From Swiss-Prot:
PANTHER family: CHROMOSOME-PARTITIONING PROTEIN PARB-RELATED, NUCLEOID OCCLUSION PROTEIN. GO terms for biological process: chromosome segregation; division septum assembly; positive regulation of sporulation resulting in formation of a cellular spore. CDD domains: SPO0J_N. GO terms for molecular function: DNA binding. SMART domains: ParB. Effects nucleoid occlusion by binding relatively nonspecifically to DNA and preventing the assembly of the division machinery in the vicinity of the nucleoid, especially under conditions that disturb the cell cycle. It helps to coordinate cell division and chromosome segregation by preventing the formation of the Z ring through the nucleoid, which would cause chromosome breakage. Its main location: cytoplasm. Keywords: Cell cycle, Cell division, Cytoplasm, DNA-binding, Septation. InterPro entries: Chromosome_partition/occlusion, HTH_ParB/Spo0J, Nucleoid_occlusion_protein, ParB/RepB/Spo0J, ParB/Sulfiredoxin_dom, ParB/Sulfiredoxin_sf. Signal peptide: none annotated. This is Nucleoid occlusion protein. GO terms for cellular component: chromosome; cytoplasm; nucleoid. It comes from Geobacillus kaustophilus (strain HTA426). Gene3D superfamilies: 1.10.10.2830, 3.90.1530.30.
């Protein structure tokens, strides 16, 4: 049976067999709950306390069917690789020990297992999911397309999630708190301007705008921006016109003498630029 993370770790057949043999020899140990620390690479930043309470009731009735997975991190401490919700649940029950399997994984492997395990559960918020994709891309030096293939998802799904990370922190926090939906957030991306995004975000929350209303507001803001007249450039002063004409006449005289001259003229809001190129030969 293939290891669920082998596609990301790129295990060969030999390494795969060795890992499976090792897993068969692994024993479940009961380790102190207080000696366990959360996974540093956990993509989930918020836990639903109601669901943890429900899990605690299930564990009290049926026990822990699947041990948590940890790794040793020195001084008698263990870091969770998989199973943080179970660990939190037994804490609520006041248990002193929890069944666990101890694995020898490095940081990269630990992060990958934690990220993929949570992605497979499909309980992450859109922003947590986006951060998990970004971390996997960084850890394994993958393209969006390669990550999509390994996770069995469409490339557009990965790309759309990653775009959420370009939104202001306030919008990302609203997504994290589930104050707005992913479709609300994706509508805000079109505005580009941070001030407008935040203003509309507040309006979405205060007025409880649905997605269609939000998209209509975005469209109106974009149309208003297109209609806004561009500021007029400063008119040429008399002295400036004289200066520009003098330069042009001088260039004509140089060219008439047989020297190759190229010039470019550009007008900016605050100045007029003339670039002159004279060939050395």
């Amino acid at each position: 049976m293939k290891h669920p993370f082998s596609r990301l770790f790129s295990f060969g057949e030999k390494e795969q067999e060795e890992m499976e043999e090792k897993q068969e020899r692994e024993e479940v140990r009961h380790i102190p709950v207080k000696s366990i620390i959360p996974n540093r690479f956990q993509p989930r930043t918020m836990f639903d306390e109601e669901k943890i309470d429900e899990l605690a009731l299930t564990i009290r009735t049926h026990g822990i069917i699947q041990p948590i997975v940890v790794r040793e991190c020195g001084n008698g401490r263990f870091e969770i690789i998989a199973g943080e919700r179970r660990w939190r649940a037994v804490q609520k029950l006041g248990w002193t020990e929890i069944p666990a399997i101890i694995k020898n994984l490095n940081d990269k492997e630990t992060a990958s297992v934690a990220l993929i395990e949570n992605l497979q559960r499909e309980e992450l918020t859109p922003i947590e999911e986006a951060m998990a994709y970004a971390k996997l891309i960084e850890l394994h030096d993958l393209t969006q397309e390669a990550l999509a293939q390994r996770l069995g998802k469409g490339q557009s799904t990965i790309a759309n999630k990653l775009r959420l990370l370009k939104l202001p922190q306030e919008v990302q926090e609203a997504l994290l708190q589930r104050a707005i939906t992913e479709r609300h957030a994706r509508a805000l991306i079109a505005l580009k301007d941070k001030e407008k995004q935040l203003k509309l975000l507040q309006e979405i929350i205060d007025k409880q705008l649905n997605v269609k209303q939000t998209e209509d507001r975005v469209l109106k803001l974009l149309e208003a921006g297109e209609r806004k007249p561009k500021p007029k450039r400063k008119a040429f002063s008399r002295d400036m016109r004289i200066a520009v004409n003098t330069i042009r006449q001088s260039l004509s005289m140089v060219e008439s003498s047989g020297v190759s001259v190229q010039s470019e003229e550009e007008e900016f809001d605050d100045y007029y630029q003339i670039t002159i190129r004279i060939a050395k030969k």
